[in-house]
Amino acid sequence: MYKNGFFKNYLSLFLIFLVIACTSKDSSNEYVEEQEAENSSKPDDSKIDEHTIGHVFHAMGVVHSKKDRKSLGKNIKVFYFSEEDGHFQTIPSKENAKLIVYFYDNVYAGEAPISISGKEAFIFVGITPDFKKIINSNLHGAKSDLIGTFKDLNIKNSKLEITVDENNSDAKTFLESVNYIIDGVEKISPMLTN
């Protein structure tokens, strides 16, 4: 039916293309894996991802659109702190940070780890420059109805003077975490403004 080995030539050509395609795919996969390994081994803590920018702006009460996050987020200053016995020390990265402080347009937001209903999460708290009021707060990594109550509250002596139900462990944890952030941000604020 086919003269002069047409089928044999067609099959040989097909096999050559198949080998080239497989080799090309393997090398591109290796390149992607190398890039992912390089990126994961050296995190860039000077840049904040858009999701975190959203949490920070929400806590600060900054109204913005999703498409503006990246450009506005470039103006956020980020500071990482370790803490021992109430004394805060700056550290170079997010790793081992007990408190992360964001500073934007003369407003502060603090981020700290929190455990809510057995889930590890992070709480963000926005604080006015005079440390007299909490602007807003929000969670990343857990959900809680309590979060809506921790906004627009007065601060006195570096803490919220409110009472929570002693039997509600999440409410106690919220209050402790918010007060920890307020106290920490107020203590380290002179370092940020210099």
From Swiss-Prot:
Coiled-coil annotation reads none
Subcellular location(s): the record lists:
Cell outer membrane
Question: Can you quote a single GO CC term?
Answer: cell outer membrane
Its record classes its membrane topology as:
Lipid-anchor
Chief location: membrane
Q: Which PROSITE patterns match?
A: PROKAR_LIPOPROTEIN
Organism of provenance: Borreliella burgdorferi (strain ATCC 35210 / DSM 4680 / CIP 102532 / B31) (Borrelia burgdorferi)
Identification of the protein by name: Outer surface 22 kDa lipoprotein
State the signal peptide span: 1-21
Which positions are lipidated as N-palmitoyl cysteine? Answer: 22
Keywords associated with the record: Cell outer membrane, Lipoprotein, Membrane, Palmitate, Signal
